[in-house]
């Protein structure tokens, strides 16, 4: 069996913990029944022992199977393309992939709602798991332990230019930087900007994204710990990025632009930040896929 799950970029400026989108950079997971347990990891995280011994994919996969009375062993080949601890949904990709794979082996129907709500048990950030499951641009929240979300597709004439620094940032640690309370003004600012940004994406008003993607809740505090991120954002917006936001909790930076502007934006960012990876990616509208039964 082969299951693939896309990278994601969440928060997107004002959409803290509720907005996210899917990027066409896929982890592929190859699983087959075996008389013994074996895991091989290729790509991102390769050669790092803890990603094998503490692998979230196999943990979730086996837990779901055992819950349904299956105690079999499997061989796993995890082909990771999503950067780890860089704010591009590596954990969500692993968890969603494990859930979808386990359900397929159990003979369950391919039900995205079932996948996303099971994934929520292991990953409580719906802004990451919804685009990983459904693809596209998603708005989501959790009510009574159930994910409520809507998706819209992202057109192919838009591209993502991702700047991926060589610095890991822990989501858990970065949350400790944030205040426990926000003022009414800060809250209204983010609510209004996130709402209008979603409308702009749905209606294709791309020229509004620059002003709509501003944030007063989380980005500044997080970016202060790694000031080069301010420079990335400034240069991206000066070179035709429609919006430029911290990807998840960082350290990666998400930039959206028109297809014709992507090569130049990549060139400028690569020149200014030669030690960082810069990648032009398509958006993904498919989400998790069973590529081979």
UniProtKB/Swiss-Prot annotation:
Catalysis performed (reactions): L-homoserine + ATP = O-phospho-L-homoserine + ADP + H(+)
Pathway where this protein functions: Amino-acid biosynthesis; L-threonine biosynthesis; L-threonine from L-aspartate: step 4/5
**EC number of the protein:** 2.7.1.39
A biological process term (GO) from this entry: threonine biosynthetic process
Q: Where does ATP bind?
A: 83-93
Enzyme class, spelled out:
transferase
Alphabetically ordered keywords of this record: Amino-acid biosynthesis, ATP-binding, Cytoplasm, Kinase, Nucleotide-binding, Threonine biosynthesis, Transferase
Q: Which InterPro entries match?
A: GHMP_kinase_C_dom, GHMP_kinase_C_sf, GHMP_kinase_N_dom, GHMP_knse_ATP-bd_CS, Homoserine_kinase, Ribosomal_Su5_D2-typ_SF, Ribsml_uS5_D2-typ_fold_subgr
Q: Which GO terms describe its molecular function?
A: ATP binding; homoserine kinase activity
The compartments listed are:
Cytoplasm
Q: Which GO terms describe its cellular component?
A: cytoplasm
Q: Which domain of life is it from?
A: Bacteria
Q: Please classify the protein's predominant subcellular localization into one broad category.
A: cytoplasm
Purpose: Catalyzes the ATP-dependent phosphorylation of L-homoserine to L-homoserine phosphate.
Q: Which family does it belong to?
A: Belongs to the GHMP kinase family. Homoserine kinase subfamily.
Which protein, by its recorded name, is this? Homoserine kinase
């Amino acid at each position: 069996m082969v299951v693939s799950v896309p990278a994601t970029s969440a928060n997107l400026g004002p959409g803290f913990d509720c907005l996210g989108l899917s990027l066409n950079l896929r982890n592929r997971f190859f699983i087959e029944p075996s008389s013994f347990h074996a895991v091989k990891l290729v790509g991102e995280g390769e050669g790092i022992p803890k990603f094998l011994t503490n692998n979230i994919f196999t943990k979730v996969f086996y837990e779901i199977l055992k819950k349904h009375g299956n105690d079999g062993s499997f061989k796993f080949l995890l082909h990771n393309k999503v950067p780890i601890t860089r704010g591009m949904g590596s954990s969500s990709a692993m968890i969603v992939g494990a859930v979808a794979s386990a359900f397929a082996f159990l003979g369950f129907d391919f039900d995205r709602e079932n996948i996303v709500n099971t994934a929520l048990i292991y990953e409580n950030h719906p802004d990451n798991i919804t685009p990983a499951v459904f693809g596209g641009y998603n708005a989501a929240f959790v009510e009574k332990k159930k994910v409520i979300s809507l998706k819209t597709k992202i057109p192919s004439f838009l591209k993502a230019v991702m700047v991926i620094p060589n610095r890991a940032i822990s989501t858990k640690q970065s949350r400790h930087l944030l205040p426990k309370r926000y003022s009414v003004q800060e809250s209204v600012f983010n609510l209004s900007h996130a709402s209008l940004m979603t409308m702009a994406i749905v209606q294709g008003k791309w020229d509004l994204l620059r002003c709509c993607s501003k944030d007063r809740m989380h980005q500044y505090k997080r970016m202060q710990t790694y000031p080069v991120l301010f420079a990335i954002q400034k240069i991206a917006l000066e070179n035709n990025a429609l919006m430029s936001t911290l990807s998840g909790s960082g350290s990666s930076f998400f930039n959206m632009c028109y297809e014709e502007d992507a090569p130049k934006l990549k060139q400028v960012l690569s020149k200014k930040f030669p030690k960082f990876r810069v990648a032009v990616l398509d958006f993904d509208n498919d989400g998790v896929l069973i590529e081979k039964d």
